[in-house]
């Protein structure tokens, strides 16, 4: 068993040895061949041709004799092959000629093909680009076709969207604002989803223009005589448009209503100041009250429930309304003051009553401005009175320039009353009839009484001091005029003229001035002045000349002209009337006290001027006290 197992091992080893030796022999033969035929046959050439390799290996395995005969055999084989080739060429020369021609033609055709291929290769890039463009255009055409097909299938829906601007414009122009707001909300949703589509952008822009037109129409409605329900609808639409904040909406509302009010006030004729201011009062009272009512019904002045967002400032919205009302009241007061300064005649009491009613109506909305009217009317009243007093002084001076002291029967009998004594109403003051003897004094008193009667229509107690001062200044000027007349005419006075001049001064100081004091006490009752100051009537003299002229001051410049008299200690009841107890306050609708109404005395035949009667004018409307 052991010997049997050994035999295959030795056989395998000998086979392996033989194969190895053969491989080594082939390697040696190849190396030998490579070194022998290095110059004739490159190694790469015979290695690539198997027949050359076999032949060389066959030669390397041949004997010496064979190697000697091999060149001859090769020469014979070569000669034989050459002969066969000649025979073949001779037998088939036509075929070879034809083949050569075909080969030449094929070469020529191959050249043409090569040239054509070159041109084709040169044109292939442009063809490739054209094909790409064609594919792209085909894809676009296909996409457009699909879009056109989709557009055709949804033609109705697209048409509705494209008609939105036209429909929006129709709704706005026909005042269908609710439908217009619904369309605007739908367009806003479209914009959020398809803002990149140009058609949608165009629709959005056209709808915005229609919304701007709608905004202008709504604000224009607020500039007309619109009622509260319509105001509520308009403000509701403006809030839905979400264009203004709450504060801006309030300002816009007030601006629009203010423009309407200004148009009404501008349309009032401005020729007659009284007509202009009465119509202005009526228009402001009615329309301003309506605007305030509308504002309070639409907007709430309560504090907001939620605090403002981050970055937003807290706006005092109630101050907007109060500031506007204050501005309107200020503008009305300016117009009132302007028209009063232009002059409204003797209708100041009627105008005061209308203004007071206007202010009273505004008290219901918390805008009572009656206190602002007092300075305006006081200033107008005192200015009118001062102007009338100044005109009276100028008129007195003109008459004194042409006045001559002439004795007349009326003068000599001045102590007696005229035959036809005028009849006066109870409670009125009768002017001194002795003034008829001296026309300048009579005319001066008449002018003063006209000023008093005009002042009586609107006579605040606060004007007592200014009226008294104005009257004192006028009397001081009259005194200077009298002194100037005396200096100019004294040298030419006769004894009779001197006596008449003394009577002139006496009547001026003892009749005219005390009568003016009594008129002042009727205009400004001492009891009323004391009640206003909150003092007893007996202490009124401590506060100066309130409501009466200081006669001694007026008398002092003329003292050297008057005759010397014994001092009398009894008080004249006419000069110092008994001060009544404070009168109870009158209700607003109570009639005013009886005015000072001078009576026209009889006029002598001597050509003296008549003392004009200045009866109280009848007011157009009941006046209210200040």
UniProtKB/Swiss-Prot annotation:
User: Where, per UniProt, does this protein localize?
Assistant: Golgi apparatus membrane
Region of interest called Disordered, as start-end residue ranges on this chain: 580-626
Task: Give the protein's recorded name.
Answer: Conserved oligomeric Golgi complex subunit 8
Give the originating organism.
Answer: Bos taurus
Which family is this sequence assigned to?
A: Belongs to the COG8 family.
Q: What is the role of this chain?
A: Required for normal Golgi function.
Q: Name one GO biological process term.
A: protein transport
Subunit and partners: Component of the conserved oligomeric Golgi complex which is composed of eight different subunits and is required for normal Golgi morphology and localization.
- Give the keywords, sorted: Golgi apparatus, Membrane, Protein transport, Transport
């Amino acid at each position: 068993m052991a010997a049997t197992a050994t035999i295959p091992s030795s056989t395998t080893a000998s086979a392996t040895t033989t194969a190895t030796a053969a491989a080594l022999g082939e390697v040696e033969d190849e190396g030998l061949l490579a070194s022998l035929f290095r110059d004739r046959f490159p190694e790469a050439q015979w290695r690539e041709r198997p027949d050359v390799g076999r032949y060389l290996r066959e030669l390397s395995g041949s004997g010496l004799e064979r190697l000697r005969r091999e060149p001859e055999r090769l020469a014979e084989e070569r000669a034989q092959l050459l002969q066969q080739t000649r025979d073949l060429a001779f037998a088939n020369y036509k075929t070879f000629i034809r083949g050569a021609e075909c080969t030449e033609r094929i070469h020529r055709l191959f050249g043409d093909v090569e040239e054509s291929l070159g041109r084709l290769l040169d044109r292939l890039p442009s063809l490739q680009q054209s094909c790409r463009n064609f594919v792209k255009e085909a894809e676009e055409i296909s996409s457009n076709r699909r879009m056109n097909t989709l557009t055709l299938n949804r033609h109705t829906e697209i048409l509705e969207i494209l008609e939105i601007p036209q429909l929006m414009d129709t709704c706005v122009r026909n005042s269908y604002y609710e439908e217009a707001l619904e369309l605007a909300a739908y367009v806003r949703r479209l914009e959020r989803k398809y803002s990149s589509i140009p058609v949608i952008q165009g629709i959005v822009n056209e709808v915005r223009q229609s919304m701007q037109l709608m905004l202008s129409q709504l604000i224009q409605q607020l500039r007309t005589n619109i009622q509260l329900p319509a105001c509520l609808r308009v403000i509701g639409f403006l809030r839905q448009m979400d264009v203004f904040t709450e504060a801006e909406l309030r300002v816009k509302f007030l601006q629009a209503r203010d423009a309407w009010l200004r148009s009404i006030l501008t349309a009032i004729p401005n020729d007659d100041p009284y007509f202009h201011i009465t119509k202005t009062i009526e228009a402001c009272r009615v329309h301003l009250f309506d605007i305030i009512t509308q504002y309070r019904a639409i907007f709430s002045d309560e504090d907001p429930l939620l605090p403002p967002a981050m970055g937003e400032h807290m706006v005092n919205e109630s101050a907007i309304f109060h500031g506007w009302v204050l501005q309107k009241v200020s503008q009305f007061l300016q117009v009132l003051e302007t028209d009063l300064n232009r002059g409204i005649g003797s209708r100041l009491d009627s105008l005061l009553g209308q203004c007071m009613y206007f202010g009273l109506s505004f008290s219901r909305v918390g805008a009572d401005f009656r206190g602002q009217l007092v300075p305006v009317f006081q200033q107008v009243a005192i200015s009118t009175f001062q102007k009338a007093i100044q005109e009276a002084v100028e008129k007195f001076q003109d008459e004194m320039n042409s006045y001559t002291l002439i004795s007349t029967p009326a003068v000599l009998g001045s102590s007696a009353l005229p035959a036809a004594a005028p009849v006066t109403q109870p409670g009125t003051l009768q002017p001194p009839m002795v003034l008829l003897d001296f026309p300048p004094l009579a005319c001066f008193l008449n002018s003063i009484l006209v000023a008093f009667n005009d002042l009586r229509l609107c006579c605040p107690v606060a004007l007592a001091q200014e009226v008294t001062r104005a009257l004192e200044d006028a009397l001081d000027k009259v005194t200077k005029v009298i002194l100037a007349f005396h200096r100019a005419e004294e040298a030419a006075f006769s004894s009779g003229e001197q006596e008449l001049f003394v009577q002139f001064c006496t009547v001026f100081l003892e009749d005219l001035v005390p009568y003016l004091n009594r008129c002042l006490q009727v205009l400004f009752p001492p009891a009323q002045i004391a009640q206003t100051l909150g003092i007893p009537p007996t202490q009124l003299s401590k506060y100066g000349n309130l409501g009466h002229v200081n006669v001694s001051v007026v008398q002092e410049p003329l003292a050297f002209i008057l005759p010397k008299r014994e001092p009398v200690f009894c008080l004249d009841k006419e000069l110092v009337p008994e001060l009544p107890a404070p009168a109870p306050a009158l209700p607003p609708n109570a009639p005013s006290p009886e005015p000072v109404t001078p009576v026209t005395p009889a006029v002598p035949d001597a050509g003296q001027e008549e003392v004009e009667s200045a009866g109280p004018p009848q007011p157009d409307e009941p006046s209210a006290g200040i």
